[in-house]
Amino acid sequence: MWNNLVAAPVARFARRDGDDFRLPLGSAHLATATPQGFRETMGATIATSLKMPPGEAAFFANRLLVFFSSCDARRFGQWEHMSWRDFVHGHKRSHEFRALLSRTLTSLLVAAKEDMASARTIGNMGEQFLGNPLEIGNDGDLDRVLNGPTNDVWIDPWVALLRGLGVRFEIGAEVRGLEVRDKRISGARIVDGAGTARTVEADHFVVALPAERARTLWSPAIREIRPELAAMDELYTDWMNGIQFYLRTSPDIVAGHAAFIDSPWALTSISQNQLWTRKLPEFGDGTVADCLSVDISNWNTPGILYGKPAKECTPDEIARESWAQITTHLNDRGEVLREADLHSWFLDPGISWQAEQRRNANADPLLINTAGSWDSRPRSHGALENLFLAGDYVRTNIDLATMEGASESARGAVNALLDVTGSGAPRCRTFTLYRSPELEPLRQMDADRYARGEPNLFDADI
């Protein structure tokens, strides 16, 4: 898969009835060795790139400095329990500040409202995103995507590799429960695709399920042995699903991701043909020239066509509403997307319209890192010796519902299993997130200040 990742070199931030701006995502060289240098350089970059008033840009840069210079104890003890909006004082700032630096950051990263998302999670990710273009703490470009259809260039080769290693997939089987005996999992109750129930016995069990599915398996017996798993009931999920628009032409939008800042549904997109090795006209009957793949991050806010949130729209209404919100951003300075160019669309099959309830159901919700949710997240391994957890809800350094977070949790589960069995096999390589060494003295100072109950050195309005 690694060789099938390609860089998306530019991001576009589109405004409705306003000037868009494009942000190159290549390497940069910013003089940030000192706190003052960081504030000035980052503030100027934000003011220039986002057309933000210099005073507000400087204020946001200072909030980043507060977080980056915070010790671990403060990050977990203070910022984890604060929303991103409160951390950046979004309720006190201008509309532009709230739209770009408070609301958009959280909706794009974690599909959450800025008054819900943990400041620690958003700050951690901001720390990585800013380090990447400086070519520190990263192993590639800031924004990378697959160079072809996900199944073709990732899932199918991965499945073939695993099968070659002896893995057997039981497609259509559902886990209904876990049996406990002598403080160990003795079996998993499953129902196969034919409706036949049976119990699978094994030496070890790895539960690699999303949080909302995994917690249904935690019986009273399991919760008695691992009481911390009961806290998973407090974990919050919301929706972040997509729709694909197949086009007869390849519109010139941007060579990477586009964010539609003023869209009620917090839409983002990417035009895939420009990044794929095998071009779209080579698929099907050749009439499709491009695919505009769109993420819908806000399913709770009414749209501009029907006055309904996406959760209450039929599939056809979702398509029309998403298209309308995108075109109002792209066509306000000239026609970029034309109705005549739309060949067809395809909605995420995880979204299903429930006619009687007049709303959608979602088979694939997204874990949201709400303020304080770290305390409700378990580790990969605990008191049940042969039970191991893998999923983006497990405590990880990445700390975000992403493939990278899930991968890190899986590495932790495998390493724990190898430790329990006393295996001499090599352990999975693990990683830590980047932190600027230049700010380490400030973080050590902050540890002393936090222990004394004092605020961060830079935690003041400017």
Regions inferred by a protein language model and the residue ranges of each:
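Rossmann-like nucleotide/phosphate-binding core characteristic of flavoprotein oxidoreductases
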Residues: 48-69, 73-91, 95-108, 324-343, ...
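Dinucleotide-binding Rossmann-like beta1-alpha1 core, especially the glycine-rich loop
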Residues: 1-63, 74
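C-terminal segments that line or cap access tunnels to active or ligand-binding sites in enzymes
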Residues: 82, 134-146, 189, 202-204, ...
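Active-site/ligand-binding neighborhood in enzyme catalytic cores
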Residues: 58-181
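Core beta-strand elements of the Rossmann-like FAD/NAD(P) dinucleotide-binding domain
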Residues: 194-204
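Short, hydrophobic/aromatic-rich segments at coil-to-beta transitions
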Residues: 183-189
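Active-site-proximal substrate-binding core of FAD-dependent oxidoreductases
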Residues: 416-462
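A generic structural motif
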Residues: 14-16, 189-193
